[in-house]
Amino acid sequence: MKRQKRNKDDRAYNRGYNAGLDGKSREDCPFGTLQARTNWMGGWREGRTDFAHGMLGVASIQNLKNIG
C-alpha cells in the first residue's frame, strides 16, 4: 500500500485508465497539477481506446492496467 502511494504518476495513470474504461468524460479529471493531469489524460486515452474496442467486463480482465 505504501508503495502505491509513493508513485503518484502511476496512480494518476491507472485512475485515468479506469475512468476511460468506464466511459467517463475527460472533464472528470480530479488532478490540478500538470504532471498528474498529463498522466491521467494518457491513461484516459488508452482506456477510451480499449472501451471503443469492446474491452469491457470479462474481456478487460486480460488487460492488467485496470487492476489496482
Curated annotation (Swiss-Prot):
Is Nucleus among the key words of this record?
A: no
InterPro entries, from UniProt? Answer: Ribosome_modulation_factor, RMF_sf
Q: What keywords sit in the KW lines?
A: Cytoplasm, Translation regulation
**Disulfides per UniProt:** none
Its GO biological process annotations read:
regulation of translation
Localisation per UniProt entry: Cytoplasm
> Would the keyword Cytoplasm be found if you checked this record's keyword annotation?
yes
Q: What is its main location?
A: cytoplasm
Q: A single GO CC term, please?
A: cytoplasm
Protein family according to the UniProt entry = Belongs to the ribosome modulation factor family.
- NCBIfam families assigned to the protein according to its UniProt record, in alphabetical order: PRK14563.1, Rmf_CrpP_fam
HAMAP family per the UniProt record, alphabetical: RMF (MF_00919)
Q: What does this protein do?
A: During stationary phase, converts 70S ribosomes to an inactive dimeric form (100S ribosomes).
The name on file for this protein is Ribosome modulation factor
